[in-house]
């Protein structure tokens, strides 16, 4: 399960892509860009475990939020497959600076040493030649973003702030606010569940994520996301670490489907009208 697959902009982009508005899809950009410094140094919750990874690992530790929705749009595991990646990281500076500026003398956390690069950048190539940029950035001051850029021969969507340009619809060389197109291209699942999901976690996408899972189980139908998707998204973590540790050498992405990705039909969210 990946809740960001169900955020409203991501599902609208999925529908727009299915309708062909962006043309042939060629490139996507995504990531998890979130200033977590204060959270990482708390004496509770994530502060009890999250820094430990930064002491011994260097790579992209959290690709799923950004890559999940992009993989859906690009038909990964359902017509295309991740082929190989290269990854590199900046030096590690942000957590050390936070130590010096915010922790009192004598705090045991001041003695910790970190190896995680503050910004990790990964490029992925698919078997059909598409490219995906994935970023991980949680140790520096910045506003939140998952980027979510999807680009094709006829246009693109770019998130944070959410904006769209579609040739023949948008003014030449200008962005349109995504809200200007939402009435026409909003995903029907959001239209169905908007009131019921109001007030739920992360703007309602957590509710829709759970609703879709329960609906699949009750109806005995395949879930929107399966174990092969989970494996594909998760393996990015160790593969980026290997590439970073080996001068950004390319590393192949395993095919957990054993070739069945070429046979499986395109994703259509359960309960939504199929786009032909």
Residue ranges with predicted function:
Residues 118:
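Short, small/polar residue-rich loop motifs at catalytic or cofactor-binding pockets
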Residues 141-161, 165-276:
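C-terminal helical cap and adjacent loop that interface with cofactors, partners, or active-site loops
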């Amino acid at each position: 399960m990946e809740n960001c697959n169900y955020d409203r902009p991501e599902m609208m982009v999925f529908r727009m892509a299915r309708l062909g508005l962006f043309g042939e899809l060629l490139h996507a950009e995504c990531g998890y860009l979130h200033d977590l410094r204060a959270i990482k140094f708390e004496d509770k919750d994530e502060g009890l475990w999250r820094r430990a990874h930064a002491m011994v690992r260097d790579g992209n530790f959290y690709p799923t939020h950004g890559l999940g929705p992009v993989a859906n749009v690009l038909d990964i595991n359902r017509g295309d497959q991740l082929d190989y990646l290269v990854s590199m990281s900046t030096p590690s500076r942000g957590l050390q600076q936070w130590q010096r500026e915010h922790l009192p003398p004598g705090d045991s956390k001041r003695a910790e040493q970190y190896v995680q690069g503050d910004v990790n950048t990964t490029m992925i190539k698919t078997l059909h030649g598409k490219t995906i940029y994935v970023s991980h950035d949680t140790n520096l001051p910045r506003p939140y973003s998952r980027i979510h850029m999807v680009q094709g021969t006829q246009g693109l969507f770019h998130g944070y702030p959410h904006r769209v340009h579609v040739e023949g619809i948008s003014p030449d060389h200008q962005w349109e606010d995504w809200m200007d197109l939402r009435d026409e291209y909003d995903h029907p699942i959001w239209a169905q569940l908007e009131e019921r999901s109001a007030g739920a976690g992360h703007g309602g996408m957590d509710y829709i994520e759970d609703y879709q899972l329960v609906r699949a189980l009750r109806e005995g139908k395949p879930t929107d996301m399966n174990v092969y998707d989970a494996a594909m998204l998760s393996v990015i973590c160790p593969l980026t670490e290997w590439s970073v540790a080996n001068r950004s050498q390319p590393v192949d992405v395993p095919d957990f489907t054993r070739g069945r990705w070429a046979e499986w039909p395109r994703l259509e969210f359960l309960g939504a009208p199929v786009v032909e």
